[in-house]
Amino acid sequence: MDAPRINKWLKPLSALYGVGVRLRNYLFDKNVLISNSFDIPIVCVGNITIGGTGKTPHVEYLIRLLHPRYRIAVVSRGYKRKTKGMIVATEGSTAWDIGDEPRQIKRKYPDLTVIVDADRSRAIGYLCDLAEEQRPQLIVLDDGFQHRKVKADLNIVLTDYNRILTKDYLLPAGRLREPAGSIQRADMVILTKCPDDLAPIDLRAAKRDLALYPHQKLFFSKFMYGQGLKPLFSDQSPSAEVRSALAIAGIASPKLFFREIRTRFPSGTDRIYPDHHEFTDREVCLLIQDWHELHRKDANAIVVCTEKDAMRLALRQSSFPQEMQERFYYLPVEVKLMFDQEKVFVDRLLGVIQHKK
């Protein structure tokens, strides 16, 4: 567990930001500002930090556990999309239409209802008004912990094992959207990106640092890159002789991705971009140059990006030369709960669904 980097010069601005956040939370706690309740059970999967906890893989994990046993809908803001208002995703929706993360979910689960709307209450109201045979039995509110206008039946908060929440700082000096103590609003907390060799002393330290209430269940999850590479533009699988890769990541915390890539492909070039990055023409040209340079050294070299980046890079297909397209892959990631916690997790989810039947 690492101590977060704090920009001390921005602490005064963080103090002002904190006043506003605390006031807003106080008004919701005292019912001066109203949270809307709905007839359909709602599970919120959110963060207290501005990203990097693996939220989308955890949303997909929840879907895998309950789908197709239950009709599930996902409601998201659709961050960085180029559209406005409420959009019901289709299989043809792009990352520009609905955002890269909702696009990733819809691509994996095409029969799922995925809606993007900055006004999450409006989107949920739309789902509640659907005919009985279409109405979801569970709504997953993606990144909605701060969206307190919606009252979730279960709040799941994710926090990165490698970035200690209680030692972080409010924006803009740190990465906290609200004070670390806000985690006490959560029903369940998942400590994400845990190492395989997590020891009992580490578990006790995590519980102590988070200072959770007795009713708050703490779970531990790890990333799994066990799946093979998936072709982005073609149907060709990579050669077993590949030793070099141009690795591309535009996510909040790319460390685990690059570590996995370099374990599989020891040589190559790493390119890091901001989270949800929209690749410019110049950046695409530089990636093509990187590819040509690497390919001259190793004729079997490939290009690998994260699964989330694949949703955006797919929009630039025509910009890449054909030979590069044929060697362009993405690396899917899944999460798994550790210490045989899955049954407890599922039972809690089922309890929420059954409670509102």
From Swiss-Prot:
Presence of keyword Kinase: yes
Top EC class for this record: transferase
Cellular component, GO, one term: plasma membrane
Top-level lineage group: Bacteria
Annotated ATP binding sites: T49, I50, G51, G52, T53, G54, K55, T56
Phosphoprotein as UniProt keyword: no
InterPro entries: LpxK (IPR003758), P-loop_NTPase (IPR027417)
PANTHER family in UniProt: TETRAACYLDISACCHARIDE 4'-KINASE, TETRAACYLDISACCHARIDE 4'-KINASE, MITOCHONDRIAL-RELATED
Role of this protein: Transfers the gamma-phosphate of ATP to the 4'-position of a tetraacyldisaccharide 1-phosphate intermediate (termed DS-1-P) to form tetraacyldisaccharide 1,4'-bis-phosphate (lipid IVA).
Listed name of the protein: Tetraacyldisaccharide 4'-kinase
Naturally occurring in which organism (per UniProt): Porphyromonas gingivalis (strain ATCC 33277 / DSM 20709 / CIP 103683 / JCM 12257 / NCTC 11834 / 2561)
Lineage: Bacteria, Pseudomonadati, Bacteroidota, Bacteroidia, Bacteroidales
Gene transcribed to yield this protein: lpxK
